[in-house]
């Protein structure tokens, strides 16, 4: 029997089988091919979706908006000041209202419980555009990019996450690698390792799919022979300078450098979910340089701008993979 995701919400990848994830990736490739060939694919004409954003975004918002319009749907965007959710109206009641008006709901915010409450009460598919715990839509874009660079043969390849390996991206990468048979390495200081509950959930999945999960504090050991080296920002915006001071001190040894990339497999690629602090050409980058004397944070500019860097392919793939998720769950 073929994969059927119609009516399903997309909350975290632990909810999906290997076959279902592979189906979404294949569908993403098909949509990318159609987009590039200029083939119309307004398969969801007449449907409408709403995007609920507690956190700002470039890639997630644009991917849902362009992807939705490519599929023929109407798209409504609500920022924190445009809805009553969580203020004058509970999340449960917001879900019940929006579920009467829209065919699908995207949520990007803080608490995982919020997106789960939406999904439990909306009566329509709900898609997790990011929470503090998980970033599942990012994962499909990441893996599609890996597939494209390794001839769609990714089983047995090794992905290394460098830096704050307890964050939502690293947690999600551990899950998707385990589901798809890729070896996952978390490399960072001991206090920045993934939570035990995530490791415990992923270990049996990794065994089933013939891959490994490794935790190490040694960057050279982690990167030697790796096929994908991935990193993310060290601190969330808005946190006090004291947090920046501490994080820069503890995570600087885990900056992705040309020296570390040279230890990786000759075919290795660099990934980052963006935005990245690789220079001083942003207000925040300049501010960090002024306060802390650091001109590059989680990745050297030379790596970010190198041929090994596939970050903009990865960013484009957000649109194609999100389109696949919407189509598969709404068709």
Question: Model features per residue range: what roles?
Answer:
Residues 284-331:
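C-terminal helix-to-coil terminal segments
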Residues 154, 178, 259-267, 306:
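Short, conserved loop/helix-junction motifs that constitute active-site signature segments
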Residues 54-66, 151-232, 237-239:
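Glycine-rich phosphate/diphosphate-binding loop of Rossmann-like nucleotide-binding domains
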């Amino acid at each position: 029997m073929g994969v059927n995701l119609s009516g399903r919400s997309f909350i975290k990848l632990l909810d999906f089988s290997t076959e279902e994830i592979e189906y979404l990736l294949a569908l993403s490739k098909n949509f990318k091919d159609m987009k590039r060939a200029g083939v119309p694919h307004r398969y969801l004409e007449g449907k409408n979706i709403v995007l609920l954003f507690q956190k700002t975004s470039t890639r997630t918002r644009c991917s849902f908006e362009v992807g939705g319009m490519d599929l023929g749907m109407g798209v409504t965007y609500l920022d924190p000041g445009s809805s009553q959710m969580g203020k004058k109206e509970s999340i449960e009641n917001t879900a019940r209202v929006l579920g009467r008006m829209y065919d699908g709901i995207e949520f990007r915010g803080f608490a995982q419980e919020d997106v789960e409450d939406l999904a439990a009460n909306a009566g329509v598919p709900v898609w997790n555009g990011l929470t503090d715990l998980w970033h599942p839509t990012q994962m499909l874009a990441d893996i599609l990019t890996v597939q494209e660079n390794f001839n769609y043969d990714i089983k047995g390849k090794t992905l290394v996450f460098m830096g704050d390996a307890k964050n939502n991206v690293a947690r999600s990468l551990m899950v998707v690698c385990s589901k798809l048979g890729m070896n996952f390495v978390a490399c960072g200081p001991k206090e920045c390792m993934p939570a035990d509950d995530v490791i415990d959930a992923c270990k049996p999945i990794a065994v089933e799919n013939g891959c490994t999960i490794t935790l190490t504090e040694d960057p050279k050991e982690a990167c030697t022979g790796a096929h994908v080296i991935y990193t993310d920002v060290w601190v969330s915006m808005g946190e006090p300078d004291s947090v920046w001071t501490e994080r820069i001190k503890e995570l600087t040894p885990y900056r992705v450098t040309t020296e570390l990339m040279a230890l990786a497999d000759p075919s290795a690629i660099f990934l980052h979910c963006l935005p990245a602090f690789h220079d001083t050409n942003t207000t925040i980058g300049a501010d960090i340089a002024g306060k802390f004397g650091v001109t590059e944070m989680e990745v050297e500019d030379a790596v970010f701008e190198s041929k090994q860097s596939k970050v903009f392919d990865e960013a484009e793939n957000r649109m194609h993979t999100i389109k696949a998720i919407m189509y598969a769950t709404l068709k």
